[in-house]
Amino acid sequence: MKRVVVGLSGGVDSSVAAYLLQQQGYEVIGLFMKNWHDDSVTISNECPWLEDSNDALLVAEKLGIPFQTVDLSEEYKEKIVDYMFNEYEKGRTPNPDVLCNREIKFDVFMKIALSLGADYVATGHYCQKSEIEVDGKTVYQLIAGNDVNKDQSYFLCQLSQEQLSKALFPIGALTKPEVREIAAEMELVTAEKKDSQGLCFIGKVRLPEFLQQKLQPKEGTIVQIDKNDPIYNVEKQAGLSLEEELKIESQKLNYRPEMGKVMGKHQGAHYFTVGQRKGLNVGGTTDPLFVIATDVDTNTIYTGLTSNHPGLFKKALFVGNSEVHWVREDLKLKEGEQMEVMARIRYRQPLQKATLHQFANGMYVHFDEPQSAITEGQFVAWYLENELVGSGVIS
């Protein structure tokens, strides 16, 4: 009988995952990860983990499976929280959920599970796994969840073959309503519980306040750039190589404060991210202002009016070689090769047609249509049909 450790988070998805595995004849152990209890950085004023670990315990009791709590707050702080601060400090916008899956759930947590004699680790993610044979070797595929509204394959875009080989996603073929229905039939305490939001396993987080505890506020200016600024109408040079063209298309525009008018003050450029409109606190404009760029060196935020301001859109992005990750290592591009894919630059974005171009120092992702708010530090993930085959950090 195969043994599976389920990461019980105290939510409905992982509860139903545990139940389904039990139905399939696995020996199931429930493990709750405690990821946070550093009082020096308060992340929010509620403490959901007590309630969550209690719900996880009640589910385990109801299913009659062994249950224990593991404290991963040290690893979490080192791998996730410090990474977030460092990224924000550099003016990049991290994605802690993607990292949490790679570094915590499918690494630290997985090692604990394997030390308990588990054959697999299961989570309540809406995604699927299948396997094929390539050159006589088993290759694992990361497939999107059947529920289009809930597909979470994007959050798993950094997993390796090794991690996938030991992972199970029992609810990947179900929709959210079906999952809730099973939980209700089984009278699981989590059946009606609403979905957790935000930072994986820490509950709700209010970012600027959380950041202010480590990154000191410093006042800077908010500058508005006109949509007709000449920076948006640069003539295309003739005779450029494909790589040079892609480089220009993916580059950050070089804004300077004197190009626009000062609209107000802010408390630190590193608290803002491209595409953001809340929190600018600038009045007196007919249309909403959006952040089109931040400059942490001069501590300036550049903004534009409306969500179709040209400063928000780009057709290409670059991923440095060290940050290109292939889930399907067998499909990895060699220098000079290209691949047509469907890609997304954020969770739940509808998939976009794009072409990957691999060069000596990294990869360009070139989209058929201009993309809004391509954000440094976020992950781009690429798919072949419904299979996520690779990802990278937008640089």
From Swiss-Prot:
- Residues annotated as catalytic: 100 (nucleophile), 200 (cysteine persulfide intermediate)
Residues with site note (Interaction with tRNA): 125, 378
What is the organism field in this record?
Answer: Flavobacterium johnsoniae (strain ATCC 17061 / DSM 2064 / JCM 8514 / BCRC 14874 / CCUG 350202 / NBRC 14942 / NCIMB 11054 / UW101) (Cytophaga johnsonae)
Where in the sequence is the signal peptide annotated?
Answer: none
Q: Which reaction does it catalyse?
A: S-sulfanyl-L-cysteinyl-[protein] + uridine(34) in tRNA + AH2 + ATP = 2-thiouridine(34) in tRNA + L-cysteinyl-[protein] + A + AMP + diphosphate + H(+)
Provide the protein's localization: Cytoplasm
User: What HAMAP family does this protein's entry cite?
Assistant: tRNA_thiouridyl_MnmA
What UniProt keywords are attached to this protein's entry? ATP-binding, Cytoplasm, Disulfide bond, Nucleotide-binding, RNA-binding, Transferase, tRNA processing, tRNA-binding
Give the EC number: 2.8.1.13
Give the region (Interaction with tRNA) as residue ranges: 150-152, 346-347
- Entry's family note: Belongs to the MnmA/TRMU family.
- Region (Interaction with target base in tRNA) residue ranges read 95-97
Against Pfam families, the record matches this protein to:
tRNA_Me_trans, tRNA_Me_trans_C, tRNA_Me_trans_M
Residues reported to bind ATP: 7-14, 33, 124
Q: Where are the disulfide bridges?
A: 100-200
For the protein in the UniProt heading, the enzyme class is: transferase
What does UniProt list as this organism's lineage? Bacteria, Pseudomonadati, Bacteroidota, Flavobacteriia, Flavobacteriales
Q: What is its main location?
A: cytoplasm
GO-annotated molecular function: ATP binding; tRNA binding; tRNA-uridine 2-sulfurtransferase activity
Please give an example of a GO cellular component term from this record: cytoplasm
Which Gene Ontology BP annotations are present? tRNA wobble position uridine thiolation
Name the chain's protein. tRNA-specific 2-thiouridylase MnmA
**Carries keyword Transferase?**
yes
SUPFAM superfamilies this protein is in? Answer: Adenine nucleotide alpha hydrolases-like
